[in-house]
Amino acid sequence: MQQFDFDLFVIGAGSGGARAARVAAKHGARVGIAEGANFGGTCVNRGCVPKKLMVYASRIPDAIKSGKAFGWDAPAARFDWNALMSHKDTEIDRLESVYERNLLGAGVQTFPEHATLLDANTVRLRNSGQVVTAQRILIATGAAPARPDFPGVELAITSDELFHLPEQPKRLLIVGGGYIAVEFAGVFAGLGSQVTQLVRGPALLRGFDDEIAETLREHLSMRGVDLVFEDRIELLQREGAALRVTTTGGRSFEVDTVLLSTGRLPNIEGLGLEAAGVEVNDKGAIVVGPGGRTTVVSIFAIGDVTDRLNLTPVAIREGQAFSDRHYGGIESPEIDYALVPTAVFTTPEIGVVGMTESQAREHYPRLRVLKTRFRSMAQAFAGSQDQVFFKVLVDDATDRVVGVHLLGEGVAEMIQFIAVALKANATWLDFRSTVALHPTIAEELVTLK
């Protein structure tokens, strides 16, 4: 029987890879993990965590403004970009050290360098040149921001660089209409920047419910975001300290910073996939079957590098299930990707689970659509023009709720528990027979008619 250095070797110590490594080690496996950038991966260092901290910061002006209606006479506030960035960096450093400490505490051997596959069971560490073998190899290298091709694209930045800008851009162009793009549009508008958003298509948030996307468009416009649809950059040039943007639609204007938010691509460069025989699709994503198995029997992949559903909790669940199955003898049910809750941290934020209305109409001929639009008690009292929008989709034949789409303050917290109800095949009768909690915006969900 062949002897290996490790039972499992993980490439990538982001949320999914780190979870898989720790769980396997706790089950008694000999585990190694390589990370060429930062422990914690995109989410901790260049994604979810720093972005959410900036979302919190961007909402402070609203709280100050509405405070007057509640009797608070707040003095004029001044935003300090460097203070936020410094505090953010301290928190990210803390979380990264927690990730590495937890891996070491579980008995995982860490290698702070990139790794390349040599064959089905062998990995070479790029900096040191060390070669290690493993019975199984798990690829969890995530994804990276895509960069569209146009003259001057090198003058633009992605979300990777955004979190390290030395100054707040006073004039910001965001290219893209997906959830990351609209989140940053809301953040920088809230922080006082002049924001223009350039969207290639006719609407925001492709893949989300049409009414949710349109309602968000209204709110972003109301908050001062200049939304430009069906246009793209033709040329980007440096003009002194500014950038000159020329679009295919004939627009020309100056900004301080151009942020590219046009999607993400699987991180496969330098992995040696071809040498190992691992198949990728036309988008560069690793092709996997049940349990994350690739076309090579000893090599597996989880998370964004597989381009199935690119969310941190999905990668974590996939990593947990992988190690439980192979090293703990525990069979976890396959993830139901159709019922994964999703949040968009705009202001107001979005929470969705299940089918969109257009998707539901393809599956359910008798679809009941319940929706409401209102201002919350706090919004009305403070004179805010923000609104709450709820939409529930019900299959009339079975009374089962097949989709819930929410926009409003705090709905990301709500959608987590609504997802539990949909996972349990809750009916609309289950929802409306539940006594409402008053006064909340959530009560409107169970009193919809």
Language-model features: where?
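N-terminal Rossmann-like dinucleotide/flavin-binding domain of flavoprotein oxidoreductases
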Residues: 1-4, 23, 43-46, 50-131, ...
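Rossmann-like dinucleotide-binding cores of NAD(P)H-dependent redox enzymes
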Residues: 90-96, 100, 163-164, 169-173, ...
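A Rossmann-like FAD-binding core segment of flavoenzymes
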Residues: 109-112, 116-125, 132, 191-290, ...
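Beta1/beta-strand and adjacent pyrophosphate-binding region of the FAD-binding site
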Residues: 2-14, 168-178
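Flexible, glycine-rich terminal cap/loop adjacent to redox cofactors
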Residues: 11-16, 20-37, 42, 49, ...
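Glycine-rich dinucleotide-binding loop and its adjacent helix/turn
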Residues: 48, 139-194, 227, 274-276, ...
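Short beta-strand "acidic-cap" motif of Rossmann-like dinucleotide-binding folds
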Residues: 29-35, 139, 193-199
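FAD-site-proximal beta/loop scaffold in flavoenzymes
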Residues: 154-170, 252-331
